């Protein structure tokens, strides 16, 4: 079982939010600037 979040936010905030998420231990990170979308999870390390 893995903790995961899907978040919508302005793309201008993605970079700072992702840096903070990494510090908190999230390893699966996906983002789509065109959709203002960020996915975070505690699964294996990967980025898309």
Model-predicted segments: where are they?
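Catalytic cores and adjacent binding grooves of peptidoglycan-active enzymes
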Residues: 1-48
């Amino acid at each position: 079982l893995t903790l995961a979040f899907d978040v919508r936010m302005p793309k201008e905030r993605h970079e700072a939010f992702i840096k903070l998420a990494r510090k908190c231990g999230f390893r699966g990170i996906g983002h789509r600037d065109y959709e203002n979308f960020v996915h975070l999870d505690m699964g294996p390390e990967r980025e898309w």
